[in-house]
UniProtKB/Swiss-Prot annotation:
Originating gene: kynA
SUPFAM superfamilies xref list: Indolic compounds 2,3-dioxygenase-like
Assembly and oligomerization: Homotetramer.
Superkingdom to which the source organism belongs: Bacteria
Swiss-Prot/TrEMBL cofactor(s): heme
Organism expressing this protein natively: Bradyrhizobium diazoefficiens (strain JCM 10833 / BCRC 13528 / IAM 13628 / NBRC 14792 / USDA 110)
UniProt GO molecular function: heme binding; metal ion binding; tryptophan 2,3-dioxygenase activity
Annotated protein name in UniProt: Tryptophan 2,3-dioxygenase
Length: 279
């Protein structure tokens, strides 16, 4: 028998799904594969749509993992949280690799359908904004693009009222023997955490004696590992946009590359990066 003659039913594989849930049913593939609606005849618009749709799917998983990691840390369940953070790094490794596919589209090819995008832009992504808020970058101005959608605004406002992932990590560290500044522990969580010398010195204790504070040391390195991948994703976003549109304004009205470059300056866990300088 050749492979072309092989019938999986001969070994007991199920082939009748008239009354059973199939692979496509479970994954709702009809809905997913029917969600691409190019607005032009340009061949490369399909690539552009699928690139962004798959990014949104990975972000859906990222939110799932980050939210669970934050809950686990708040309950002192650090080992499961570290597994989730490790997965977050792999998710953003996947997202970084995806830029290579989009870079196969040239400026000439993009201009054939760019006008069809109207004012839509990636900075309007509600999931990306939720990830930024979860991680502690709490720019209230970024609520404005969602003001037309009451449900999304409610979701983002609720996240702003919740301690960020890093807030929970600092509280965990305080519960486990590090002395975190009271002003940091009691701060308004709706605002972005800014660098604090007391937090830096607390992490210095961990990094100067990792064997004594192994759990916190390992957790800190998981955070740094993740932010490393996240920074690379932002950088790849900048270089891809510059490669495709140069320094034109973004479709959403931002400065395009100049806006994205400002995002490269954002530090999610500033003390974990600066502690390396003082060791």
């Amino acid at each position: 028998m050749t492979s072309s003659d092989y019938d999986p039913a001969s070994e007991g594989a199920e082939t009748d799904f008239s009354r059973r849930m199939s692979y496509g049913d479970y994954l709702a593939l009809d809905a997913i594969l029917g969600a691409q609606h190019p607005l032009s005849e340009a061949h490369d618009e399909m690539l552009f749509i699928i690139q962004h749709q798959t990014t949104e799917l990975w972000m859906r998983l990222a939110i799932h993992e980050l939210s669970a990691a934050r809950r686990a840390i708040a309950r002192d369940e650090v080992q499961p949280a570290m597994k989730m953070l490790a997965r977050m790094s792999r998710i953003f490794e996947q997202l970084n690799n995806a830029w290579d596919v989009l870079r196969t589209m040239t400026p000439s090819e993009y201009t054939r359908f760019r006008s069809q995008l109207g004012q839509s832009s990636g900075f309007q992504s509600r999931q990306y904004r939720l990830i930024e808020y979860l991680l502690g970058n709490r720019n209230h101005a970024m609520l404005k693009p969602h003001a037309h959608d009451a449900e999304v605004t409610k979701l983002l406002e609720a996240e702003l009222a919740t301690p960020s992932l890093y807030d929970e990590v600092l509280r965990l560290a305080d519960r486990n023997g590090l002395t975190m500044p009271a002003a940091v522990l009691s701060r308004d969580v709706r605002e972005t955490h800014s660098f604090n010398e007391g937090v830096l010195q607390a992490w210095r204790v961990v990094y100067e004696a990792p064997e004594t504070h192994w759990m916190l040391y390992e957790l800190a390195e998981k955070l740094v590992d993740f932010e490393d991948y996240f920074r690379r994703w932002r950088f790849n976003h900048v270089t891809t946009v510059e490669r495709v549109i140069g320094f034109k304004r973004g479709t959403g009205g931002t400065g395009g590359v100049s806006y994205l470059k400002r995002m490269l300056e954002v530090e999610l866990f500033p003390e974990l990066w600066r502690v390396r300088t003082i060791l």
